[in-house]
């Protein structure tokens, strides 16, 4: 028996591997990937507004529109809607105007959006009814939920058809004070009546909660259906009417975001029951949607599984793209039904190095879905040597690259007394000089052009990315005069001497307070736990501030804690990025619009920047179609923020994805968030490749055998010596 156990141990030793998945998982029709941060905080389509969350939200929820996965420039396509529509315009008397009517004549823009008939919600207990038509699980008493932590632990699951009223209800949810609603400030400026609706719902919510404990986890269901919203009406079951205040061309793009995806009232009623919050049952973990996938496994900070939605509508892979797509094999699946895979499995791997190694071994089909820098990172590795390049080519790693509309920047909290706006004209002048000095000192060209090339890009000169209408980034002679200058026809970063002068104007000569002599210490609120590779980037940033004599203190937290900090306005200097929601300058300029303040209005202006003239121009920009007037307004807004320097601008990142050779149809595209539905996996190729790349490791067996032989020889010699000694003693 001991011999059998030993043989088994040796066999296991030879066959062991570091696959994070069960044996045989590679043979399944499943897409495997990693996530490096904590689990997503918000999967509720009303609340979700981060790139890691979008990996799941856009596959589970379906807004009216989406983006063609292959065409560039980006092209809108219908998703939950039957078609992409143009608005019509009304004057103050409700009379219809021509499409080219002047903006000052337009009182309303009306979108009549046909909803696809036959759309069904994913299976969920919220829809289950008994024989009398009564909801089975809408009247749970305390304790009845038990230890159930997933909707799929309920006996009865059901569905129903999606109707226009579900889209109306979703828009109303942006007024619910119990939900995180980051775009409510934007929507309330445009959707007719939404601003008043916010006040109404807040008042009714307060009434409902009167007398209840403030920290009550399971608040009663706030039924938004009882209060009408003028700007969102269901004309019939399959026609949604949205009314906007005046012309707002960018609304078509908002219709392609999760914020306009339908939500069933039954889900809110279901989750607003005793015990749900304690058991982590909510739309933020178990959203109800109409998309190709549904969340079927959620293990906090460890593993998420999306499975094929059995109720998903008929959908097919596109048959056209842009030049080069056919040659790259991206049209080979023309007309085939999607999604291709049955499951999408994401596992938590904390650091980039192990993610990269798992990808190289074939265990991950792609590193991370939401990160557009993995292709850049691996391309740097590939080009490091001929040997590595040959290795990459032999394994067939796909690294498609592009320059996309996304950015990374260092921001200053406008509410902070040192780096923010300042309370007096004199303080405002000093703080602005400090921000400008820092903006000059941080050499983005060095950091993310030469050192951290795996995350690299081009230094930014303002908030408007190249590739959208009106952008001047990268054009000859175009630069930020605060941070750069023209030398012999070449744009160069201003010398540190210019930054030193600004430090003196700010009252910090040599990095010390001119009045007290104390060193200037600033806090850098970092949104991730610092790993060794992230430490290198942070150390580089510390050196940039040290050029000015400024001490930079790193205050690192995980992403969820960072979000809490910025909501309270407790941050000072921070690192942030933005992947465009839609291909328009407004989607970047709104990050600096005052009413979108993150800490004051829970918007996406994380710097809490406020400038009345910038805000006035932003409001004007919103009603302008692409043309000379819009370009002029954009230029003026660019000039304002360059002078104010609420951001240190950072860089425009390169976009590059990474796929195994057996993953088909992958293409970079920052606004295409529903990529998983289009990806096809050749499981047979994956199975063969993983077996070939990760064969049994025999050297431990050899070492074991050599060690065993040495022990045997040593034991034999000792035994022989003892026998000889015994024989010698006996002869005496």
What are these regions (language model features)?
Residues 1-18:
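N-terminal export signals
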Residues 15-24, 69-70, 113-180, 205-233, ...:
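Extracytoplasmic/periplasmic ligand-capture domains
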Residues 34-103, 288:
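N-terminal lobe/hinge region of extracytoplasmic solute-binding protein
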Residues 37-57, 68-69, 77, 125-128, ...:
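A structural "hinge/loop" feature
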Residues 105-107, 236, 300:
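Residue-level recognition of beta-strand termini and adjacent short loop/turns
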Residues 236-239, 249, 261:
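Aromatic-residue-lined binding/catalytic grooves and analogous aromatic/hydrophobic interfacial grooves
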Residues 264-268, 272-274, 657-694:
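A C-terminal, polar beta->alpha supersecondary segment
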Residues 635, 640-663, 667-668:
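Extracytoplasmic/lumenal ectodomains and periplasmic regions of secretory and membrane proteins
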